[in-house]
């Protein structure tokens, strides 16, 4: 299955210019894409999410919203915490996006509940400082996720597969750890989701925990419009955003703990660059694997793995 990422469920959920956001007028173009994927014999999925505070007024057309009010240095911008009465409509936006995905010919949706985006911002004690029923205890912090999943599963019905990408760890002190994220996974299992994609990291606080390797400071700052932020990141970025060494299957140790406790299908992602390691991961009981960078490096890598037992991507 080929998954298209990332598509915002509302305009306020856009994190970059020219990003997809789900609305009726883009359905015909997406249908062309899914028709092409299906013609090649594959299934098509689309990742749906809302970036929360990871945006800017110049991108999303409004003051960015999040689990709590504050200032996000990553954007950089002030952020308005969503009111409790706004949350049901935000959850319904996820459901509407599932319906649009169906119209566009997608076979599956992947709900993005990780990496410090909106659902993740509600889940993490680092970004959720609310004093109402959506903040404080883990049970409260999961309420918005529960609301979203109710709308998603209702819209998905019996003909759309629903995967959820979630964090096993946020990747920094004060973020979510396994004791809480295992509970999140069990709640998602109860929600009726069909599979979990196990990831980790927080784009605004621990981006290289997600991707591993050295932070591409020059490439990242090239696209920054704010001159003082660009200068600051180039000067102190490598200390503010430390590198995290890359190794093959870098999330496997944590993912195996989920495999032991969670009965539903699990998808492994993170550092897969060889057929040998993919076979090893699948032998550990994961129903599927997900790749991104290896396929950007070599779009035909999956086809080559069919032919070569020792196939390895040039991606590092």
Where are these regions (language model features)?
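Flavin-dependent oxidoreductase catalytic cores
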Residues: 1-316
């Amino acid at each position: 299955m080929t998954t298209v990422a990332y598509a915002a469920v509302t305009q306020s959920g856009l994190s970059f210019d020219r990003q997809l956001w789900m609305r009726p007028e883009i359905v015909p173009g997406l249908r062309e894409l899914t028709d092409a994927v299906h013609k090649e014999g594959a299934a098509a999925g689309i990742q749906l999410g809302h970036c929360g505070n990871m945006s800017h007024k110049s991108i999303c057309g409004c003051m960015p919203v999040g689990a709590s009010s504050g200032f996000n240095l990553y954007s950089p911008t002030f952020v308005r915490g969503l009111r409790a009465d706004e949350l049901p409509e935000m959850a319904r936006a996820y459901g509407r996006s599932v319906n649009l995905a169906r119209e566009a010919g997608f076979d599956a949706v992947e709900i993005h509940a990780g990496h410090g985006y909106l659902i993740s911002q509600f889940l993490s004690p680092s970004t959720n400082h609310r004093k109402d029923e959506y903040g404080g205890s883990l049970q409260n912090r999961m309420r918005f996720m529960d609301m979203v999943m109710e709308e998603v599963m209702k819209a998905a019905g019996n003909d759309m597969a629903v995967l959820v990408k979630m964090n096993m760890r946020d990747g920094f002190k004060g973020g979510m750890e396994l004791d809480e994220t295992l509970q999140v996974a069990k709640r998602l299992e109860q929600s009726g989701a069909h599979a979990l994609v196990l990831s980790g990291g927080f784009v605004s606080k621990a981006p290289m925990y997600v991707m591993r390797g050295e932070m591409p400071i020059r490439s990242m700052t090239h696209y920054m419009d704010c001159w003082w932020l660009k200068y600051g990141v180039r000067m102190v970025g490598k200390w503010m955003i430390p590198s995290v060494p890359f190794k093959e299957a870098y999330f496997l140790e944590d993912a195996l703990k989920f495999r032991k406790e969670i009965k539903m299908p699990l998808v492994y992602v993170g550092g897969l660059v060889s057929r040998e390691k993919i076979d090893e991961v699948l032998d550990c009981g994961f129903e599927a694997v997900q790749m991104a960078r290896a396929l950007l490096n070599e779009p035909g890598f999956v086809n080559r793995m069919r032919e070569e037992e020792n196939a390895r991507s040039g991606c590092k």
